[in-house]
Every structure is written in structure tokens, then in C-alpha cells.
Amino acid sequence: MNHPVLLLVSGILIGLLLGFFLHRLASDFLEQQISEQHPWDGKPDLPSRLRQIVFLLMLPLVSGVLAAWRGWFPELLSDLLLTGSLFVLAVIDWESMLLDMRVVIVAIMLKSAWLFVFAIEHLQQALIGLLVGAGLLYFLGIIYETLRKRRGLGEGDPALLGLIGMWVGWPGLGPVMLVAAFSGIILGGIWLLRKNQPLLHTPVPFGPFLCLGGLLVYLLQQSGWMPWQMELIAF
């Protein structure tokens, strides 16, 4: 079962099962927001085809690659937990400007349980990453709101960065923020231009770019491309 092809196929199948579950979870959350008449326009900017592409194509492919890379080791569980959580949070935030805090809380609890069982020596630094990540973005949000007299971050963004901090550790939070900021400026700017929306006055969800930064930095850390951080976050 450790043959790369078998691992790849098995990972894709696991990703499909996970994708079907997360697709249903995201759809139910978005439908609930519409039914409760939450103060957004009631219709996602992108059709449900986005969810199908992300959960039924991208997630299985990423899961297959992770399985082929990790093999059947405990680290694969941690990888899939982070990947699945970030995928579903990114899609929900992109379509509704909201974050499902249930996903964040469950992911934090499962990661804590994983660390307790498989890497208890890293539990403390993971919790530090959680607290620093959440506190950092909350503090930056207060500063932005004070200076600009308007909210710049969503209420769930600090919790999302805290979640990411459990995987990348506090040293990885800076690179995550840099990737999120640059990708948000570039990709968000392109999206606004295509929609013919004003660049400075149209809100763009920041969560998807945090998810992109978190996943990218974590994979770079684990693959050894950030060796100066590996001693602190190699779990």
C-alpha cells in the first residue's frame, strides 16, 4: 500500500469523500444565511460551480498529492485536516463574506487532539501560534478601524489566523500575512477590475487569501523550503 500510485489513488478517493462532505457543509451554511436574511445580497458572487470545482476537483487532487508525499503516517491526518478546513472556510468566505466558526472550532479541537496523541511535545508551541495569530490580527483590525473609521477585517479573520498558527507556529505567521496581503492585492484587484468595481471602496473577503497563505507557508515549511523555521514547527 506504500506504492506511490496506490497512495495517490487512495488519497484522491479520500479527498472525494471529504469533498462531498465539505460541499454539503458549505452549501447548507450559505443556504442558512440566505434564509435568515443576513445583511448581504442573498446571492453568492460565484455560482455553486465554484464549490464543485474546489471540493470535487481541487481538494481530491491535493489530497492525492499529500498522500503520495506523506504515506500512511499520522502527519497525513494533520495535513488533510488543515487542507479541508482551509478549503471550506475560503469558499464560504468568498461567497458570503462570512466564516463558519463551527469549522474553526472543530479544526482547533481536532488539531489539539492530534498533537496530544502524536506530538504532545509540540502542543504548547501550537497553542502559542493560535494565541499569537488570533491576537495579532485582532490588534491590527483595531488599529485599522481606529485610523480609517471603518471595519477592515471580518470578525472571523483573527480566529482563522489563529487556526493557521496552530500549524505554522508563531514564526510562520509573518510569511502567511505577507502572502495573504500580496495575493489579496493582486488577485482581489484583478477580480474587482473584472467586475468593474471601485478598488478602494469595495469590500473583498480576506479569509481566502489567509487560507492560501496558510496552506502555502505550511507546505513550504514541511518540505524544507523554510529551514530556519523547521525546528520550531516541524509537526
Where are these regions (language model features)?
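A membrane-topology feature that recognizes alpha-helical transmembrane segments
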Residues: 1-235
